[in-house]
Swiss-Prot record:
HAMAP family: Ribosomal_uS4_B
KW rRNA-binding (keyword) present: yes
Keyword hit for Transport: no
GO molecular function: rRNA binding; structural constituent of ribosome
Name of the protein: Small ribosomal subunit protein uS4
UniProt GO cellular component terms: small ribosomal subunit
Amino acid sequence: MKYTGSIFKRSRRLGFSLLENNKEFSKGKKRKTIPGQHGNRFRSSTMSGYAQQLQEKQRMQYMYGITDKQFRRLFRLVLKQRGNLAVNLFRVLESRLDNIVYRMGFAPTRRSARQLVNHGHVLLNDRTVDTPSIILNPGDKVRLKAKTIKIPIVKAASESGVVSPFVETNNKTFEGTYVRFPERSELPAGINESYVVEWYKRLVK
């Protein structure tokens, strides 16, 4: 509950559902405004360019559950790639192993997907791995171990049937394939990735 509470608080502060399901803003929650005495006034005020970049960076960082150090390392990787920098940044984040486990519907949140990987419940191309930050390529195969299938949150997540279009899964065997890189239209719409790019362009050389 401690982690869930912090996610709800961060989501309200950033005005964005980090869980991608708007649970943080559901009617059952006591607070729907930005935490703090002046939450509503802050939200309505005009933000500076710096503040907008910081907010978008935090939205993306907290949604994928990575540290600023990890973000900078990923950004350096993206700088070497061809194509649209902002789209490539999103694609690299989406290609992380913990995110793919989440996108395949094997875990209810990225955090729980990351824990599954950390504790050795996940096989990548038939090899047990414990590094959530591994970057996958299209064609890579992910599978959960037999004992993992019995974990309640794994069963519940799989039964929800929420699977992204750029992966293929088999809910009976709990295995899936990363079919292709996602299109921008298939990714979270509430983030302006161009602000994130501008933020890290100043910091990463």
